[in-house]
Amino acid sequence: MPRLSEAEIAEQLAQRPDWSLENNEIVRTFRLANFPAAIAFVTHVAFLAEAAGHHPDIDIRYNRVRLALTTHDAGGLTEKDFALAAAIDEIMG
């Protein structure tokens, strides 16, 4: 899958305002009710990621979960990253 251009990334980010661009990754931090809720959320993300064959970097800090997406094989952001971001956003409603 080809890397997205800067213009394509900006267009995609406009549709995902809760995500931001940091060092060739898109990132979002989620705040959950408590630690068990954070783990349940991460488990749901894990199943989505496995089904997509695309896995985020995950950082859990009590009730906060930071997700970072990039396509390592492409050396940057691709449609895969934004498709998974959209699926993750759907979980949160």
From Swiss-Prot:
Secretion signal span: none
Keywords: Lyase
Reaction catalyzed: (4aS,6R)-4a-hydroxy-L-erythro-5,6,7,8-tetrahydrobiopterin = (6R)-L-erythro-6,7-dihydrobiopterin + H2O
Its EC number(s): 4.2.1.96
Keyword Phosphoprotein in record: no
The keyword Ribonucleoprotein appears for this protein: no
Biological process per Gene Ontology, one example term: tetrahydrobiopterin biosynthetic process
GO molecular function: 4-alpha-hydroxytetrahydrobiopterin dehydratase activity
InterPro entries with a match to the protein in the record: PCD_sf (IPR036428), Pterin_deHydtase (IPR001533)
Family the entry assigns: Belongs to the pterin-4-alpha-carbinolamine dehydratase family.
NCBIfam families: PRK00823.1-2 (NF002017)
Stated name of the protein: Putative pterin-4-alpha-carbinolamine dehydratase
Protein source organism: Chloroflexus aurantiacus (strain ATCC 29366 / DSM 635 / J-10-fl)
